[in-house]
Regions:
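The feature captures the beta-strand-to-loop junction immediately N-terminal to the Walker
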Residues: 31-33
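Conserved ABC ATPase "signature" region
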Residues: 106-124
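Conserved ABC ATPase signature
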Residues: 128-132, 136
Length: 223
Protein backbone atom coordinates (compact mmCIF):
# COMPACT_ATOMS: atom_id res chain seq x y z
CA UNK A 1 0.00 0.00 0.00
CA UNK A 2 1.40 3.36 -1.01
CA UNK A 3 0.43 6.86 0.05
CA UNK A 4 1.99 9.53 -2.18
CA UNK A 5 1.62 13.14 -1.17
CA UNK A 6 -1.71 12.14 0.33
CA UNK A 7 -3.73 14.83 2.10
CA UNK A 8 -7.21 15.13 3.47
CA UNK A 9 -9.11 18.35 3.99
CA UNK A 10 -12.47 18.60 5.65
CA UNK A 11 -14.44 21.83 5.80
CA UNK A 12 -11.26 23.69 4.86
CA UNK A 13 -9.51 22.11 7.83
CA UNK A 14 -6.60 19.74 7.32
CA UNK A 15 -7.18 16.31 8.85
CA UNK A 16 -4.07 14.88 7.24
CA UNK A 17 -1.04 16.83 6.02
CA UNK A 18 0.80 15.51 2.94
CA UNK A 19 2.22 12.12 3.71
CA UNK A 20 4.29 9.56 1.88
CA UNK A 21 4.07 6.06 3.20
CA UNK A 22 4.90 2.63 1.86
CA UNK A 23 3.26 -0.11 3.91
CA UNK A 24 4.54 -3.58 3.14
CA UNK A 25 4.35 -5.15 6.60
CA UNK A 26 1.63 -7.63 7.50
CA UNK A 27 0.92 -5.95 10.84
CA UNK A 28 0.73 -2.18 11.04
CA UNK A 29 -0.57 -0.37 14.12
CA UNK A 30 -1.88 3.20 14.08
CA UNK A 31 -1.90 5.14 17.32
CA UNK A 32 -2.24 8.77 18.37
CA UNK A 33 -4.36 11.25 20.25
CA UNK A 34 -8.07 11.72 19.67
CA UNK A 35 -8.64 13.54 16.42
CA UNK A 36 -5.05 13.02 15.23
CA UNK A 37 -6.14 11.45 11.94
CA UNK A 38 -6.02 7.69 12.56
CA UNK A 39 -9.52 6.91 11.30
CA UNK A 40 -8.96 9.27 8.40
CA UNK A 41 -5.81 7.38 7.39
CA UNK A 42 -7.56 4.03 7.87
CA UNK A 43 -10.52 5.14 5.74
CA UNK A 44 -8.23 6.38 3.01
CA UNK A 45 -6.47 2.99 3.05
CA UNK A 46 -9.78 1.19 2.68
CA UNK A 47 -10.99 3.36 -0.19
CA UNK A 48 -13.87 4.65 1.93
CA UNK A 49 -12.83 8.25 1.36
CA UNK A 50 -10.82 9.85 -1.43
CA UNK A 51 -7.75 11.91 -0.74
CA UNK A 52 -8.07 15.66 -1.27
CA UNK A 53 -4.59 15.62 -2.76
CA UNK A 54 -2.09 12.94 -3.78
CA UNK A 55 -2.94 9.27 -4.20
CA UNK A 56 -3.43 6.04 -2.28
CA UNK A 57 -2.59 2.76 -4.02
CA UNK A 58 -3.81 -0.53 -2.59
CA UNK A 59 -2.81 -3.80 -4.27
CA UNK A 60 -2.11 -1.87 -7.45
CA UNK A 61 -5.45 -0.04 -7.41
CA UNK A 62 -5.84 3.70 -7.07
CA UNK A 63 -8.44 4.18 -4.33
CA UNK A 64 -9.86 7.28 -6.05
CA UNK A 65 -10.33 5.57 -9.41
CA UNK A 66 -10.94 1.98 -8.36
CA UNK A 67 -12.64 2.40 -5.00
CA UNK A 68 -14.96 -0.51 -5.77
CA UNK A 69 -12.05 -2.89 -6.35
CA UNK A 70 -10.31 -1.70 -3.21
CA UNK A 71 -13.43 -2.21 -1.13
CA UNK A 72 -13.85 -5.69 -2.62
CA UNK A 73 -10.50 -6.85 -1.29
CA UNK A 74 -10.73 -4.95 1.99
CA UNK A 75 -12.59 -5.76 5.16
CA UNK A 76 -13.21 -2.73 7.34
CA UNK A 77 -14.29 -3.01 10.96
CA UNK A 78 -15.65 0.24 12.36
CA UNK A 79 -15.38 1.50 15.88
CA UNK A 80 -19.15 1.53 16.17
CA UNK A 81 -20.51 -1.94 15.35
CA UNK A 82 -23.97 -0.53 14.73
CA UNK A 83 -22.71 1.04 11.54
CA UNK A 84 -22.13 -2.37 10.02
CA UNK A 85 -24.68 -4.76 11.43
CA UNK A 86 -27.52 -4.75 8.94
CA UNK A 87 -29.71 -7.77 9.57
CA UNK A 88 -31.73 -8.42 12.74
CA UNK A 89 -30.48 -11.94 13.46
CA UNK A 90 -26.74 -12.47 13.93
CA UNK A 91 -26.45 -15.45 11.59
CA UNK A 92 -28.40 -13.63 8.85
CA UNK A 93 -26.09 -10.68 9.19
CA UNK A 94 -22.98 -12.80 8.76
CA UNK A 95 -24.56 -14.60 5.79
CA UNK A 96 -25.38 -11.23 4.21
CA UNK A 97 -21.69 -10.29 4.00
CA UNK A 98 -20.90 -13.64 2.41
CA UNK A 99 -23.72 -13.32 -0.09
CA UNK A 100 -22.71 -9.79 -0.97
CA UNK A 101 -19.20 -10.96 -1.76
CA UNK A 102 -20.41 -13.85 -3.85
CA UNK A 103 -19.57 -16.81 -1.62
CA UNK A 104 -21.63 -19.88 -2.57
CA UNK A 105 -24.54 -20.46 -0.24
CA UNK A 106 -23.36 -24.00 0.50
CA UNK A 107 -20.28 -22.54 2.21
CA UNK A 108 -22.06 -20.00 4.39
CA UNK A 109 -22.96 -22.12 7.41
CA UNK A 110 -19.50 -23.62 7.73
CA UNK A 111 -17.65 -20.34 7.35
CA UNK A 112 -19.91 -18.74 9.92
CA UNK A 113 -19.44 -21.63 12.38
CA UNK A 114 -15.67 -21.52 12.01
CA UNK A 115 -15.33 -17.79 12.72
CA UNK A 116 -17.89 -17.78 15.51
CA UNK A 117 -16.10 -20.64 17.22
CA UNK A 118 -12.77 -18.89 16.91
CA UNK A 119 -14.18 -15.72 18.47
CA UNK A 120 -16.08 -17.84 21.00
CA UNK A 121 -19.42 -16.35 20.11
CA UNK A 122 -21.20 -19.42 18.72
CA UNK A 123 -23.88 -18.95 21.35
CA UNK A 124 -24.89 -15.65 19.71
CA UNK A 125 -25.71 -17.20 16.35
CA UNK A 126 -29.49 -17.09 16.65
CA UNK A 127 -29.71 -13.93 18.74
CA UNK A 128 -31.23 -10.61 17.73
CA UNK A 129 -28.40 -8.17 17.06
CA UNK A 130 -30.17 -5.26 18.75
CA UNK A 131 -30.49 -7.26 21.95
CA UNK A 132 -26.76 -7.90 22.25
CA UNK A 133 -24.44 -5.99 24.53
CA UNK A 134 -22.07 -3.44 22.99
CA UNK A 135 -19.13 -5.83 23.20
CA UNK A 136 -21.11 -8.70 21.73
CA UNK A 137 -22.12 -6.47 18.82
CA UNK A 138 -18.51 -5.49 18.31
CA UNK A 139 -17.56 -9.18 18.13
CA UNK A 140 -20.37 -9.87 15.67
CA UNK A 141 -19.25 -6.93 13.49
CA UNK A 142 -15.72 -8.32 13.50
CA UNK A 143 -17.00 -11.82 12.69
CA UNK A 144 -19.00 -10.34 9.81
CA UNK A 145 -15.80 -9.13 8.21
CA UNK A 146 -13.65 -12.14 9.09
CA UNK A 147 -16.03 -14.62 7.46
CA UNK A 148 -15.29 -13.05 4.08
CA UNK A 149 -11.51 -13.50 4.50
CA UNK A 150 -10.54 -10.19 2.89
CA UNK A 151 -6.96 -9.73 1.63
CA UNK A 152 -6.60 -6.57 3.67
CA UNK A 153 -8.17 -6.10 7.07
CA UNK A 154 -8.54 -2.62 8.51
CA UNK A 155 -9.66 -2.54 12.12
CA UNK A 156 -10.59 0.86 13.49
CA UNK A 157 -10.66 0.51 17.27
CA UNK A 158 -12.36 -2.89 17.15
CA UNK A 159 -11.94 -3.63 20.86
CA UNK A 160 -13.18 -0.47 22.59
CA UNK A 161 -16.21 -2.22 24.08
CA UNK A 162 -14.56 -5.54 24.85
CA UNK A 163 -13.51 -6.96 28.18
CA UNK A 164 -9.90 -7.92 28.74
CA UNK A 165 -10.38 -11.54 27.77
CA UNK A 166 -12.10 -10.74 24.48
CA UNK A 167 -9.62 -7.96 23.64
CA UNK A 168 -6.76 -10.40 24.08
CA UNK A 169 -8.61 -13.04 22.12
CA UNK A 170 -9.10 -10.63 19.23
CA UNK A 171 -5.49 -9.67 19.40
CA UNK A 172 -4.41 -13.35 19.34
CA UNK A 173 -6.82 -14.04 16.56
CA UNK A 174 -5.52 -11.13 14.51
CA UNK A 175 -1.94 -12.29 15.14
CA UNK A 176 -2.75 -15.66 13.59
CA UNK A 177 -4.44 -14.27 10.46
CA UNK A 178 -2.59 -14.68 7.19
CA UNK A 179 -3.87 -11.34 5.86
CA UNK A 180 -2.40 -7.87 6.04
CA UNK A 181 -3.85 -6.00 9.01
CA UNK A 182 -3.99 -2.29 9.81
CA UNK A 183 -5.05 -1.87 13.40
CA UNK A 184 -6.11 1.46 14.91
CA UNK A 185 -6.22 1.39 18.68
CA UNK A 186 -5.72 3.20 21.96
CA UNK A 187 -4.96 -0.14 23.64
CA UNK A 188 -1.23 0.01 23.13
CA UNK A 189 -0.56 -3.44 24.62
CA UNK A 190 -2.40 -5.03 21.69
CA UNK A 191 0.36 -3.90 19.34
CA UNK A 192 3.41 -5.34 21.08
CA UNK A 193 3.89 -8.08 18.46
CA UNK A 194 3.25 -5.78 15.48
CA UNK A 195 5.93 -5.23 12.86
CA UNK A 196 5.39 -1.51 12.54
CA UNK A 197 3.59 1.17 14.53
CA UNK A 198 2.83 4.65 13.21
CA UNK A 199 2.07 7.52 15.56
CA UNK A 200 -0.09 10.39 14.35
CA UNK A 201 -0.38 13.78 15.95
CA UNK A 202 -2.55 16.59 14.59
CA UNK A 203 -2.61 15.12 11.10
CA UNK A 204 1.10 14.37 10.89
CA UNK A 205 3.23 11.27 11.43
CA UNK A 206 5.45 11.89 14.44
CA UNK A 207 6.88 8.38 14.73
CA UNK A 208 7.06 5.33 12.50
CA UNK A 209 8.95 2.51 14.08
CA UNK A 210 8.81 -0.78 15.96
CA UNK A 211 6.16 -1.01 18.72
CA UNK A 212 8.46 -0.31 21.68
CA UNK A 213 10.03 2.76 20.14
CA UNK A 214 6.78 4.11 18.63
CA UNK A 215 4.83 3.63 21.86
CA UNK A 216 7.58 5.30 23.89
CA UNK A 217 7.54 8.28 21.54
CA UNK A 218 3.77 8.48 21.67
CA UNK A 219 3.82 8.47 25.48
CA UNK A 220 6.45 11.19 25.45
CA UNK A 221 4.40 13.30 23.03
CA UNK A 222 1.35 12.90 25.29
CA UNK A 223 3.20 13.72 28.50
N1 LIG B 1 -16.92 13.53 8.84
C1 LIG B 1 -16.14 14.51 9.32
N2 LIG B 1 -16.44 15.81 9.07
C2 LIG B 1 -15.63 16.80 9.52
N3 LIG B 1 -14.51 16.59 10.23
C3 LIG B 1 -14.19 15.34 10.52
C4 LIG B 1 -14.98 14.22 10.08
N4 LIG B 1 -14.40 13.07 10.51
C5 LIG B 1 -13.30 13.46 11.20
N5 LIG B 1 -13.17 14.79 11.19
C6 LIG B 1 -12.07 15.57 11.80
O1 LIG B 1 -10.84 15.11 11.24
C7 LIG B 1 -9.83 15.05 12.26
C8 LIG B 1 -9.25 13.65 12.36
O2 LIG B 1 -10.27 12.76 12.80
P1 LIG B 1 -10.06 11.19 12.91
O3 LIG B 1 -11.42 10.59 13.08
O4 LIG B 1 -9.24 10.72 11.77
O5 LIG B 1 -9.22 11.09 14.25
P2 LIG B 1 -8.79 9.81 15.11
O6 LIG B 1 -7.30 9.91 15.29
O7 LIG B 1 -9.29 8.56 14.50
O8 LIG B 1 -9.48 10.11 16.51
P3 LIG B 1 -10.12 9.17 17.67
O9 LIG B 1 -8.97 8.58 18.44
O10 LIG B 1 -10.85 10.17 18.50
O11 LIG B 1 -11.02 8.15 17.04
C9 LIG B 1 -10.50 15.52 13.56
O12 LIG B 1 -10.20 16.87 13.73
C10 LIG B 1 -11.98 15.33 13.29
O13 LIG B 1 -12.74 16.27 14.00
Amino acid sequence: MTFSGTTLERNRKTALYPLDLELTERRVGLIGANGSGKSTLARLAGGLIRPSGGTVQVAGYDTAKDAKEVRRITGFVFQNPDSQIVYPVVEEDLAFGLKERGFPKAEHAERISRVMERLRISHLRGRLAHELSGGERQLVALAGVLVTEPDLLILDEPTTLLDLRHSRQISEHVAALPQTVIFVTHQLELLTEFERVIVLDQGRIIADSDPDDAIARYKKAMA
